[in-house]
Amino acid sequence: CEYDYEGWHPTPYVAREFYGVWGDFEVKITIDKKYILGGTGYLQNPNQIGYGYETPGAKVTQPAGDKLTWHFIAPNVHDFMWAADPDYKHIVRTTSNGVTLHVLYNFKPNDPRNDTAWKDVADAAVTVLPYIEKTFGPYPYKQYSFIHGGDGGMEYPMGTLLVGPGLGTVFHEWMHTWYQMLMGTNESLYPWMDEGFTDWASSKVEAFYRDNVTRKKLIGNAAAIKRMDSLAAILPKDQSDSYRSYFSLAKSGFEEPMTTHSDHYNSNYGYGVAAYSKGEVFMEQLGYIVGAEVRNKILLEYYKQWRFKHPNATDLIRVAEQVSGIQLDWYKEYWVSTTKTIDYKIDSLWEENGVSKIRLRRVGQMPMPVDMQLTFKDGNT
């Protein structure tokens, strides 16, 4: 239950969106010695635990008995997560700025591909964190844990539970650190500021990884590079999937305004596309209006001004207006508070005094700046 400028928010948690206050956690978990744990926070007794948590070079001295007490401290977080499994294998990496990354996954005998896939998670995290921090703001904690869980993917402070080592899910859940764990937006009222912004950010991280890691791995393999480039030419680009999902929703009759409480949508379909896809398109279209470079500056300023402060949609727009110098209330009101759509058509085309002229007509009810590209007979644009 959270109290803010609107009063108390006693919204029940129904395994969907949540809204909570930051606090400091101290947690002690006593469990059979055979279990390996991972989760939120910093382990306070690593040299009594071992399992890869010990200080490099230190001798592990576990207490007598068949149980261990794991002692965690987690400052300035709004939830605490932990997982335990006797079959976890623990990979540890340290980034250039001193953040410790933990990967805990279920070891499978005689399955080296499983080991390689989870090792790739650790290596990819080290690779992309500098890009993430430069683009979205510094990671403020000392550790992050990628933990093999039982279902899907779910984000928590300092860690995530993952059903598998797919990097798309890994990046998405990690980016929830920037778009929820650090912002603390009321997800019940603004799920699109959580899931939509995370979708948009993780697509950028995936593109960075693809261009800077995947492609480099293929150097010297001309056939593989050609195959990757040919696939890239026909596969969706960045936000294309989200645009298609939004278009389908807009035509379906199930769309509701994004101001709808996340638990009160008439359909899960309407909620899902609004929160994820239309939220992602919101961020991409903002870049179309103000320019991608300015949009990126907006995100860094948003992080600077509003981390650990529970921003709402108006707070975001005010930052965008400050950075861009453009009035943007209209954009928020049309896109978020209505289901009006953007659609323009060519109304007429004529020649006047040797000059070709084109008149556009707005068909949809939502206004939007429009760029037009003309292609001439010789192929020039």
Listing of model-derived features with the role each one plays in the protein:
Residues 367-381:
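Low-complexity, glycine/alanine/valine/leucine- and proline-rich hydrophobic stretches
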Residues 31, 76, 352, 364-366, ...:
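Short loop/turn positions at the edges of beta-strands in beta-sheet-rich folds
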Residues 37, 363-368:
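A short beta-turn/strand-edge loop motif at beta-sheet boundaries
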Residues 2-171, 200:
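Hydrophobic helix-coil surface modules that form long, contiguous segments used
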Residues 40-44, 86, 189-195, 297-301, ...:
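Composition- and surface-driven signal marking solvent-exposed, interaction-prone regions
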Residues 72, 103-363:
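Hydrophobic alpha-helical and helix-loop surface patches within well-folded domains
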